[in-house]
């Protein structure tokens, strides 16, 4: 992915509602009202002291010139005492200005970092209250970007733009007032330089922008080509495409070179052009100032002060343009943060939740209807009773609604109609955390985090002892392979857990479910990622584990669920058949067709 653009072609991200976002941001800053007021006062003071400095310093220049004149005419000399006092006054002003600027920056840094700290905490807490629907609708990268990039962009944008906006506006107005006080005619000449510079800069920006856009496109293309070639290096080599791939890369690289050269060349023209125009303005001002000084309208020191102000006049204008970009970027980031914080949350738990400490495992589905989009239900009218301790297998083609039923049972989603009961109580009567503690679960997608194998298994029950963790690993047939790894149970898994095989990941997640020792067990494709021998070992362990527990087994490979007490066959969101393995085969219905088709595939 291409990086951010620099130079005149940079196009900042803009918020959809700038005013509304800034209003929310100020509301967030309400608790820091007094420190913010102090920051603004210090910023104004620092700028004001900096503005009056050149005017006071000009009196020293005037005194020096006057003293030289007196000395040459024999009427006196230079009053160094007076000049020294003036210089000390200016030094004191600049020192106070620097102190004000230091404390203003220190206080503002504290405010912005406290705000960032608070927002990260609020986003993290919000994530745990968000419905599963949100995470299935949005990418993981987008959610992570809110808590890292957007919060950082927002806080750094505030630190850079808030005081700069105040100081630069104050500087612009203050410098203009001081220039007018010295000479309105010289000020007029100085102001004429601005539109000339603006016109020339605008023409350069307009011409260079298309090259910056082309540069970014070509940069994205070259990054994509490198990533594609790197990811598919084996395929490139296998088909002897190294030469062709290099030619394609060279063509993109050449386009990037041409567009980058033109954009950087035109961008580089801005500085010499604006410098030339501003220097031309200096020449005109000095010429006019010398004429006015000769007539006694102004002093030599006034000319020196005016040139100083003239140099400072264009700086805040340039910085205000940059601040505008920073504010847009900051507001866009803040808008994304606030949009996330304003997202609808899961319905609150009941005020008096049902006790869940001694759940037996009786589960009932009563006319359940559900759809990820309510207008398109995937579960139509599902009813089923599962007594405690029974093993129920749920089978059916992809999209039949098998995994959806598990999500509803654990309240990752709530039903659109009907109800699900656990031990005779509607699952919505339990607090979500209490309900989910009653489930041990092994999902299709194995999830392990960075840490030791011991820590990953213990995630199922944080208070478990090492001996209990090892016992769970043995029950899941994971102990043998763990002991062959470097470090054994203390081996560190990396962030993606790529230093163990997919089958080993599956065994570790099963060990975690064993350790949880919950009354209800959910196995979603639990043996889909292991070899036949490992699957047999796991199946034996699961048969032992499921005794005395209500177990829901979801599997496409029907050979793994022959021993289930009941098999529910789902099709298009409905239960079309139910019974034991032998009963369903004897009926010769949809289940028998599924089973026979898999058997034929194995034989073939």
Describe the residue ranges of each PLM region:
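Short intracellular "coupling" helices and adjacent cytoplasmic loop segments at the cytosolic face
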Residues: 2-13, 113, 121-145, 149-151, ...
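Juxtamembrane loop-to-helix connectors within ABC transporter transmembrane domains
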Residues: 20-21, 29, 108, 128-172, ...
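Alpha-helical segments in transporter systems
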Residues: 26, 34-59, 90, 105-109, ...
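An intracellular "coupling" helix at the cytosolic face of ABC transporter transmembrane type-1 domains
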Residues: 31, 132-133, 151-158, 162, ...
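Transmembrane helices of ABC transporter permease
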Residues: 31, 35-48, 59, 160-214, ...
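Transmembrane helix-loop-helix hairpins at lipid-water interfaces of multipass membrane proteins
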Residues: 36-100, 180-185, 283, 294-300
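Helix-loop-helix
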Residues: 67, 178-192, 262-335, 340-341
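ABC-type nucleotide-binding domain
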Residues: 349-350, 356-604
């Amino acid at each position: 992915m291409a990086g951010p653009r620099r130079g005149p072609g940079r196009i900042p991200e803009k918020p959809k509602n700038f005013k509304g976002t800034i209003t929310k941001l100020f509301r967030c800053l309400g608790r820091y009202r007094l420190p913010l007021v102090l920051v603004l006062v210090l910023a104004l003071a620092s700028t004001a002291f900096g503005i009056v400095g050149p005017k006071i310093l000009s009196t020293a220049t005037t005194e020096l010139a006057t003293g030289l004149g007196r000395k040459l005419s024999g009427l006196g000399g230079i009053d160094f005492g007076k000049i020294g006092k003036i210089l000390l006054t200016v030094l004191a002003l600049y020192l106070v200005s620097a102190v004000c600027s230091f404390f203003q920056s220190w206080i503002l840094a504290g405010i912005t970092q406290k705000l960032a700290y608070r927002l990260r905490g609020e986003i993290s807490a919000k994530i745990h209250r968000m419905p599963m629907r949100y995470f299935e609708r949005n990418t993981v990268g987008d959610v992570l970007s809110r808590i890292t990039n957007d919060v950082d962009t927002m806080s750094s944008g505030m630190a850079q733009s808030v005081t700069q906006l105040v100081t630069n506006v104050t500087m612009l107005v203050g410098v203009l007032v001081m220039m007018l006080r010295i000479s309105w005619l010289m000020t007029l000449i100085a102001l004429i330089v601005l539109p000339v510079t603006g016109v020339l800069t605008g023409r350069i920006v307009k011409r260079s922008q298309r090259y910056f856009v082309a540069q970014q496109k070509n940069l994205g293309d070259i990054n994509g080509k490198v990533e594609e070639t790197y990811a598919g290096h084996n395929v490139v080599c296998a088909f002897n495409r190294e030469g062709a791939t290099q030619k394609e890369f060279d063509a993109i690289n050449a386009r990037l070179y041409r567009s980058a050269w033109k954009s950087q060349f035109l961008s580089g023209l801005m500085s010499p052009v604006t410098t030339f125009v501003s220097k031309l303005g200096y020449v005109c001002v000095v010429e006019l100032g010398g004429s006015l000084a000769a007539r006694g309208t102004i002093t030599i020191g006034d000319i020196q002060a005016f040139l100083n102000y003239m140099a400072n006049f264009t700086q805040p204008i340039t910085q205000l343009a940059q601040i505008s970009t920073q504010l847009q970027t900051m507001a866009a980031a803040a808008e994304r943060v606030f949009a996330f914080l304003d997202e609808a949350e899961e319905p609150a738990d009941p005020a008096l939740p049902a006790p869940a400490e001694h759940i037996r495992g009786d589960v009932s589905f009563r006319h359940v209807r559900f759809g990820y989009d309510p207008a398109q239900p995937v579960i139509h009218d599902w009813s089923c009773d599962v007594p405690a301790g029974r093993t129920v297998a749920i089978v059916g083609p992809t999209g039949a609604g098998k995994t959806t039923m598990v999500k509803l049972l654990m309240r990752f989603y709530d039903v659109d109609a009907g109800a699900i009961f656990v031990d005779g109580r509607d699952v919505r009567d339990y607090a979500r955390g209490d309900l989910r503690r009653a489930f041990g679960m092994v999902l299709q997608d194995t999830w392990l985090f960075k840490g030791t194998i011991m820590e990953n298994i213990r995630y199922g029950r944080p208070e478990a002892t090492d001996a209990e963790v090892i016992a769970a690993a043995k029950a899941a047939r994971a102990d043998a392979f763990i002991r062959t790894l470097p470090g054994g149970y203390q081996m560190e898994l990396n962030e993606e857990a790529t230093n163990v095989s997919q089958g080993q990941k599956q065994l570790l997640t099963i060990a975690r479910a064993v350790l949880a020792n919950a009354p209800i067990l959910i196995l979603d494709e639990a043996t889909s990622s292991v070899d036949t021998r490992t699957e047999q070992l796991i199946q034996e362990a699961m048969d032992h584990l499921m005794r005395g527990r209500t177990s829901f087994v979801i599997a496409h490979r029907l050979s793994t669920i022959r021993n289930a007490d009941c098999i529910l066959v789902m099709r298009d969101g409905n239960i079309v058949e139910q019974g034991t393995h032998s009963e369903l085969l004897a009926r010769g219905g949809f289940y028998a067709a599924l089973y026979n088709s898999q058997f034929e595939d194995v034989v073939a």
